[in-house]
Design a protein with these regions (language model features):
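Catalytic donor-sugar/metal-binding loop of nucleotide-sugar-dependent glycosyltransferases
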Residues: 163, 173-190
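Terminal low-complexity segments of carbohydrate-biosynthetic enzymes
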Residues: 201-274
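Active-site donor/metal-binding and catalytic loop motifs
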Residues: 185-203
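Short, well-formed alpha-helical segments that are part of the catalytic scaffolds
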Residues: 10-24
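Acceptor/aglycone-binding surface of glycosyltransferases and processive sugar-polymer synthases
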Residues: 63, 67, 89-154
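A conserved acidic beta->alpha catalytic loop
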Residues: 36-44
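Glycine-rich, basic loop-to-helix element that forms the pyrophosphate-binding segment
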Residues: 58-72
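Short beta-strand-to-loop acidic/aromatic patch adjacent to the donor-nucleotide binding site
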Residues: 74-85
Length: 274
């Protein structure tokens, strides 16, 4: 059995789309929830009017996922972002079928997003840091490691989850370090609102470095140097638009700088093209 948990904050305008997909994907014994992350626009009331169980959660993506995990009584949980306008394939159904077909511990949904071809956090933070600090993890995620569409064994989500946008990083890395197997599934073409999430880049970078430090991949005394390495990358992400070719090149160059000492052997490596 699976719990389908649609997670969102102030998504009343689009919430029904994700819930419809979840109900279409669910079977006997499954549950469909809306995890309401401190919404103020009536999202929870809308979900209830559709017969959906609402799980209240504090503000923050990780806090919302933690609330879902805490309440979950099934072996697997399927997380869905609530701001779906459309997908060419039913996202939760595709994830469920991939889980059944592969027997993986986690399946992450990948998709084409024509309206958002520029994803700097993936290429400028996740890629260079994980490639060096957690090379065994990097190999499991080809296109969209930070996807909010995923299905996994609830036991995979061990330890306190990051409160915000680092939750996908946590699931990806700790799952791999625990010997869990991750597969990906193509959910087609996605359409949804493009929003600025100013805290996301810093939270993703911090989550990667926090795990690296806690598990001995990064020396505690070297952490400040790695935080300093991130600073120009974070600044450029905040300043760079999809059509700004000059700053995009500057961002690529910043992400390709040699990483500081204090990480695994070989960390002091130029990662051109990150």
């Amino acid at each position: 059995m699976i719990t389908f948990a649609v997670v969102g904050h102030n998504e009343a305008a689009l919430l029904n789309n994700a819930l419809e997909q979840a109900y279409a994907a669910s079977g006997p014994g499954d549950s469909v929830w809306f995890v309401d992350s401190a919404s103020t626009d009536g999202s929870g009331e809308l979900a209830r009017s559709l017969g959906t169980k609402v799980v209240r959660a504090p503000l923050g993506k990780g806090r919302a996922v933690a609330a879902a995990i805490e309440h979950c009584q099934t072996e697997h949980i399927c997380l869905l972002d609530a701001d779906i306008e459309s997908t060419t394939r039913n996202a939760p159904e595709t994830l469920r079928r991939a889980l059944e077909r592969t027997g993986a511990d986690m399946v992450v949904g990948e998709f084409d997003w024509p309206d958002k071809p520029f994803r700097p956090v993936t290429h400028s933070i996740w890629a260079p840091l994980v490639r060096v600090l957690f090379p065994e993890v990097a190999a499991s995620f080809r296109r969209m490691p930070l996807s909010g569409f995923r299905i996994f064994d609830v036991a995979l989500a061990r330890g306190p989850l990051p409160p915000g946008y680092g939750v996908e990083v946590h699931l990806n890395i700790l799952g791999s370090l625990d010997g869990r197997r991750t597969e990906t599934a193509d959910i087609g073409t996605y359409s949804g609102p493009i929003r600025g999430n100013p805290g996301l880049p810093e939270e993703v970078g911090a989550a990667i470095l926090d795990i690296a430090e806690s598990c001995g991949r990064l020396d505690a005394g070297a952490r400040a140097s790695w935080d300093e390495w991130l600073e120009p990358v974070l600044a450029l992400i905040g300043e760079t638009g999809a059509d700004d070719k000059l700053r995009r090149r500057m961002l690529t160059e910043a992400a390709a700088r040699p990483l500081p000492e204090g990480g695994p052997a070989g960390a002091l490596t130029n990662l051109g093209g990150a």
